[in-house]
Every structure is written in structure tokens, then in C-alpha cells.
Design a protein with these regions (language model features):
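Feature captures the catalytic ectodomains and active-site-proximal regions of enzymes
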Residues: 1-509
């Protein structure tokens, strides 16, 4: 007998502030299907940032955090919050992995290298963590400390990197240790789509001292701006000739979010890496990941291991014999699988996964704002019609990925592409007798411009919509958060809410 699926449809980066029209691609878009769904079915807004998702107050949400909270059915305190707390209470200075690996370099007269995203974006890393590790290195007596700074410009203003580098240099001057050895854009050093040609350029700067050259970090970033390249696209530049990573050194990757730290970590740590030829083979370094990037990664240690989550939605469905599908294009595949499952890499029994390749024929997604949404929708529709699944978790990447480009007209087209795709899958679910919970993981496309008209490329702290489609004439409450979604879904799946899920249903009895 064909199953009546319960779908969670996630419009990545689709924040909801209909009264703020300036620079709002969500409002500007022609989206008849979404407008009708929001008008004709019960709708509320839910919080997707700050303490509501386990981040510090006022911190914008992001895809990793959003999917983790949705899948867990409880507020999950994030690595950002946990690491910041460990600095404040002094626990970082006793962290056994950091102590051991720093000591190994110091005792051998070798260098400590800090590598990672610089700034206060808080999505992949945070300046406070750099400052904490630098203070720890000083406290332990380190003298050779080199910084390999990856510039942001996606989760922060595209020209904010200059200020972040100045703040970092001021800290180095204050402590009297550390030299910025290289500056690279995240486009090169933090790829997640196996564009090894990009990563190779960043690696060459870190290890061989090859690439552009500048006298210091400020000169490197100013030269990049003068060349029309914002933070994200800074061509890897060497700013200290003696700062190369060498055998016996300690490397600490400062990012706490896994997805964009995995590839560079694999280059340094995996003997079996084949993405490009590493001259002289793998560097024999002591490698520390700030958080766990991949449980299967060899030759590295994790400073802050993941908090174990039990009875997340995927696990709970599997235990109860339910079938489930996770589907997204490449850019968000990890989010509907690894992150939604609370950091578990392998699928649960009864969990099928389908990844649709993200476009490779464009360098940035503003040039193809529909991305692979039509293909995701077509595949999902076929899976719905198969009658095989009790639960489907689907992500459309467009509003987030195109939102990050800062190109307003393209973001509008991205919203319109999502409108068409959502209509296709919602219609299929309703025709199958199922229901859809339509939402987003965080805001982005609803704020594409700064007040002065310059592009705004980061996420926002805005709420996101939550629409209950085909769920009956229910009333939805205000003031909820992403952790409340799984407890809202479970009664429609025919299961009680497990005690581990502390989120509360968004449906008012």
C-alpha cells in the first residue's frame, strides 16, 4: 500500500520580514505558489538565530545549526557557544588535545600554525577563538606562531576582512607573538565541492610559499580590493616568507564547522589523498581540528569532540520501522544528512539518500539562480509517487547560495525558482494524501542590501516561515523555534514525542 508521506520542505536562506521591502528578494519575487500556500494554510514564524538555536544572543543562524536543531527536536548548543565558554572559564588552557599538540611543537623548536576563517561571522569560526588560542600559545611559551588567514565575505560584509586583519594584528602586537604568514579567500581555501584546483592554490601558499606575495596582510588585502576581488575571492598571498608549514610543525584548523574544513584537512592528513599531487608527499605535522570534521579522518586530533545526541528524528524514525528519504543538491546534501542526523555520517536503517549534483558550469550561482532546484523537484516527485516513504526531508539551496552572492536580481530569480519547485513537490505530496511542513533554516535572501545600497551577503537574524500544509485546520503558535519542528511532525507520522526531544509542538491544542 502506498504511503502517505510527511514532508519537511526546507527553503534554505528564506527569511520572513514582509514589512521590510528594501533589498528584500523574497518580497520582490513573483511567487504565486508560496503566496497561496501562506494565505490558504496555517502559518506562523519561528526563531532561527541566537539562543533559540544554541548560539550566542544576536548571532545569526546558519545551515549547519538550523538543520541540527530541526533534526534533534531540541535546542543544541553549538560549538561556537561551547568554545567561547571554555575560553571565558579558562578550560581551553587545559584542553588536553591543544596542550599536547602545542607542547609537541614547542619542545621540538618547531612552529605552531593557526589556519582558518578570520572574523566575527560566527558561522565557521570566531575571532574570539583565535584570540584564545593565541593567548594559550603565549602562556605555554611558544615563540614561532604563524597565522594563515582565510577571508570571509559571505557570512560577513565583502570588505570587512581588512578590519578583521587589523584587529588580529593588534592582538598579535599586544601579545608579542605571531606573524600572519598568508592570506587567502575562502573560495580557494574552504571549498566543499571537490574543486581541488582551488584548494591547491591555498595549500601552495601554506606549504610551499607560492602564490601572490605581499609585505604584510594589509598590503595583500588592499591589493585584492584594488584588483576588484572582495574577501571571499582573495587570491592566496604569502605575507611571510618563513611561515611555511613544515614537517614536525603543529597545525590547528580554527574552524568549528565541518563542511568547509574537510577538504583542506584531508590534504594535510590523508595518506590516500589523490585530489592533486602533494610535492614530497603528505606533510608530517601534528594536526588539530577545532571540532570533528569527519569521524573517518586519519592523522588528526579533535579539540572539541561533538556532543552525542540520542533519539534525533532520523534515528527515532528508524527505530520505529519508518522509511525516510533525504534529498538535496550537493551544496546542502550534508545538511539534510550529516547535520540533520546530529553529526552521524552513516544513514540509519530505512533511510535513503539522494544527492542531485549542484551546477558546475558556473563559477558563482548568481549566474544560474535556479541551480539544480528543477532536478531536485523532479526526483523528489518521482520518489513521492513511488509510495515508499513515510517521511521526506528536502532542501532547496537557492535562496541561501544565491543570497550569498549579493546580486539582488539573481536572488529574486532564486526565490522564483524555489516557488516553482515547492509547488511541484507540495502538489505531489497532497495528491499522495500526505502533508507538508514548509519552513527555512535561517534568513538570507530577504536582506540583500545594506542601507547604503551596497550588497549584503550574510545570513540574518530574522525569523523564518512555518506553514502546515494538508495538516487539517490547526492553529499554530507564535514564539517557536527550529527545535519545535520535529515534535510538531511526529503525531502526523503516528509516533509519540520521545523524552529527549524537549522542543514543543507548534500546534496549539
Amino acid at each position: 500500500m502506498a504511503k502517505k508521506p510527511v514532508m519537511l520542505c526546507i527553503m534554505d536562506g528564506f527569511g520572513w520580514t514582509p514589512d521590510e521591502t528594501y533589498g528584500n528578494a523574497v518580497v520582490a519575487a513573483n511567487k504565486p505558489h508560496l503566496d497561496a500556500l501562506m494565505k490558504n494554510y496555517p502559518m506562523t514564524t519561528i526563531n532561527a538565530s541566537g539562543m533559540a538555536v544554541g548560539l550566542p544572543d544576536g548571532q545569526m543562524g546558519n545551515s549547519e545549526v538550523g538543520h541540527t536543531n530541526m533534526g534533534a527536536g531540541r535546542i543544541v548548543y553549538q560549538q561556537l557557544t561551547l568554545i567561547t565558554k571554555s575560553i571565558k572559564d579558562g578550560e581551553m588552557f587545559k584542553n588536553p588535545v591543544l596542550v599536547k599538540n602545542m607542547k609537541a611543537a614547542i619542545d621540538a623548536g618547531k612552529a605552531i600554525h593557526l589556519m582558518g576563517l578570520v572574523g566575527t561571522g560566527g558561522v565557521h569560526s570566531h575571532a574570539d577563538h583565535w584570540f584564545g588560542v593565541l593567548e594559550m600559545a603565549k602562556h605555554m611559551g611558544a615563540t614561532k606562531v604563524y597565522l594563515h588567514c582565510i577571508m570571509d565575505g559571505r557570512d560577513t560584509d565583502p570588505h570587512s576582512g581588512k578590519g578583521f586583519l587589523a584587529d588580529l594584528q593588534a592582538k598579535l602586537d599586544e601579545l608579542g607573538i605571531g606573524t600572519i604568514a598568508s592570506v587567502s579567500g575562502r573560495y580557494y581555501a574552504m571549498d566543499r565541492d571537490n574543486n581541488w584546483d582551488r584548494e591547491e592554490k591555498a595549500y601552495a601558499a601554506f606549504v610551499y610559499g607560492e602564490g601572490n606575495h605581499a609585505a604584510n596582510a594589509q598590503e595583500a588585502i588592499e591589493a585584492s580590493y584594488a584588483d576588484g576581488k572582495t574577501d571571499e575571492f582573495v587570491i592566496p598571498a604569502v605575507t611571510c616568507e618563513g611561515g611555511r608549514v613544515e614537517d614536525g610543525d603543529t597545525v590547528i584548523f580554527m574552524n568549528f564547522r565541518p563542511d568547509r574544513a574537510r577538504q583542506m584537512t584531508r590534504i594535510f592528513c590523508d595518506d590516500a589523498f589523490t585530489g592533486f599531487e602533494r610535492r614530497g608527499g603528505r606533510k608530517q605535522v601534528h594536526y588539530v581540528c577545532m571540532a570533528e570534521y569527519d569521524a573517518t579522518m586519519p592523522n588528526c586530533e579533535v579539540a572539541y569532540p561533538p556532543v552525542e545526541l540520542s533519539n534525533v528524528l532520523g534515528e527515532y524514525l528508524s527505530k520505529n520501522g519508518k522509511t525516510q528519504l533525504r534529498i538535496a543538491e550537493t551544496e546542502k546534501y550534508a545538511h539534510v544528512t550529516f547535520f540533520f542526523n546530529g553529526g552521524v555520517e552513516a544513514p540509519y536503517e530505512g533511510e535513503d539518500r539522494k544527492v542531485i549534483p549542484s551546477p558546475k558550469d558556473v563559477p558563482t550561482y548568481d549566474l544560474k539562480p535556479q541551480m539544480s532546484a528543477p532536478e531536485v523537484a523532479d526526483e523528489c516527485k518521482a520518489r513521492i509517487e513511488s509510495g515508499k516513504y513515510d517521511v521526506i526531508v528536502l532542501n532547496f539551496a537557492n535562496c541561501d547560495m544565491v543570497g550569498h552572492t549579493g546580486v539582488f536580481d539573481s536572488a529574486v530569480k532564486a526565490v522564483e525558482a524555489v516557488d516553482a519547485a515547492v509547488n511541484e513537490v507540495v502538489t505531489a505530496v497532497l495528491n499522495a494524501g500526505g502533508c507538508v511542513f514548509l519552513t527555512a533554516d535561517h534568513g538570507n535572501a530577504e536582506k540583500m542590501k545594506n542601507p547604503d545600497g551596497t550588497p549584503f551577503t550574510a545570513h540574518t537574524t530574522n525569523p523564518v516561515p512555518f506553514v502546515a500544509i494538508g495538516c487539517g485546520d490547526v492553529k499554530l503558535r507564535e514564539g517557536g523555534c527550529l527545535a519545535d519542528i520535529a515534535p510538531t511532525m511526529l503525531p502526523y507520522i503516528g509516533l509519540p514525542v520521545p523524552s529527549e526531544m524537549t522542543g514543543k509542538s507548534l500546534i496549539v491544542d
